[in-house]
A protein has these predicted regions:
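C-terminal helical cap(s) of enzyme catalytic domains, especially alpha/beta-barrels
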Residues: 54-64, 198-212, 254, 266-291
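Short gly/pro/ser/thr-enriched loop/turn and capping motifs at secondary-structure boundaries
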Residues: 48-53, 130-132, 194-197, 268-270
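N-terminal capping/small domains of soluble enzymes
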Residues: 1-96, 102
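A short, charged, Gly/Pro-tolerant segment at domain boundaries
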Residues: 294-302
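Small/polar glycine-rich anion-binding or flexible loop at a beta-alpha turn
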Residues: 244-248, 270, 302
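Active-site metal-binding loops of divalent metal-dependent hydrolases
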Residues: 22-23, 242-244
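Alpha/beta enzyme core
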Residues: 32, 103-239, 245-258, 263
Length: 302
């Protein structure tokens, strides 16, 4: 019987699959559907220091091999989460990851301080948010901007700090090196790709903001390439995500060197995707005589 446990940040996780932010609520919503204890963790719906109403207009559009979303970080805010969502999230029997974004360095720092004090397991910093002090350019585009925000956050973060990277970064290897140098304990990538769709009848973009984030199997080969680059650039753990639908998909990321994986869009297709993929990984390992994930992690790199 394969041992699916993963050692990450000095702790042992039950499995290599973590539910990705924005696709799994805060966790309790799925507690009656699947056994969450077999997961490596749950990264809850993305938060900002203060709540946001999200975007107007269309928010979701299915593509031939993916999903476009323009949610706009709708969320109740950090304090509401701490008081109303976190207690139930802690009962799910798996590692509590909290995804946080902010429009200024100060917002990020204050949010991290509050969340760490509330008792979470991992802080996942989303640096795809626009930096209002840099003309709206996301923190995750230029390495120097990412290094600045991660450095400030790492000084106050008392739990493992995972930085979630944007695929729009100018250079994935340089970005990874910058956030590692700034104090990140791990990296997750990649976030959604910017995409566009046109409504032919209205003769205008489907989404009010013109562009939306593309996820799903269409991006998987590109995400895998970026994970490969990240693993080769840094010495901290890399969590791979982007279009994982099956155990075989997840194993590709692990063989590329990922310490663990996150599953996102697949949860919309199959509410049991995370536990199913975990089981499929174990089945493949048993069929191939692989006892632990360490035996195959990074094996494709030679």
């Amino acid at each position: 019987m394969a041992d699916l446990r993963v050692n990450l940040f000095g702790k042992q996780l039950a499995g290599p699959v973590i539910a990705a932010s924005g696709t799994f609520g805060f966790g309790p919503e799925y507690a009656g559907i699947e056994d969450l204890r077999v997961l490596g963790g749950i990264s809850g719906k993305g938060l900002t220091l203060n709540g946001q109403p999200g975007n107007d207009g269309e928010r979701l559009l299915e593509t031939p091999s993916g999903l476009m979303n323009s949610i706009g970080l709708q969320n109740p805010g950090v304090q509401h989460f701490i008081e109303n969502e976190l207690p139930a999230m802690k009962t799910c029997g798996t590692s509590v990851w909290v995804n946080l974004g902010g429009h200024t360095i100060e917002e990020n720092v204050e949010g991290v301080q509050k969340l760490c004090a509330a008792g979470i397991d991992v802080l996942e910093l989303n640096i795809s948010c626009p930096n209002v002090k840099q003309g709206g350019l996301a923190f995750g585009i230029r390495a120097k901007d990412a290094e600045e925000v991660v450095s400030a956050v790492s000084k106050v973060c008392t739990v493992p700090l995972v930085v979630k990277l944007s695929p729009q970064a100018e250079s994935i290897p340089d970005m990874c090196k910058a956030v590692e140098a700034a104090g990140a304990d791990g990296i997750s990538l990649c976030n959604t790709f910017q995409a566009c769709a046109i409504d032919l009848e209205k003769r205008r973009p489907v989404f009010n903001n013109t562009f939306a984030g593309l996820s799903g199997p269409a991006i998987r080969p590109i995400a895998l390439r970026m994970v490969w680059q990240a693993v080769g650039a840094v010495n901290i753990p890399v969590i791979g995500l982007g279009g994982i639908l099956t155990g075989r998909d997840a194993l590709e990321f692990i063989m590329a060197g990922a310490a663990a994986v996150q599953v996102g869009t697949a949860n919309f297709l199959d509410p049991k995707a995370c536990t199913r993929i975990t089981a499929e990984i174990g089945e493949w390992m048993d069929a191939h005589g692989v006892k632990t994930l360490d035996e195959i992690r990074g094996c494709a790199r030679g």
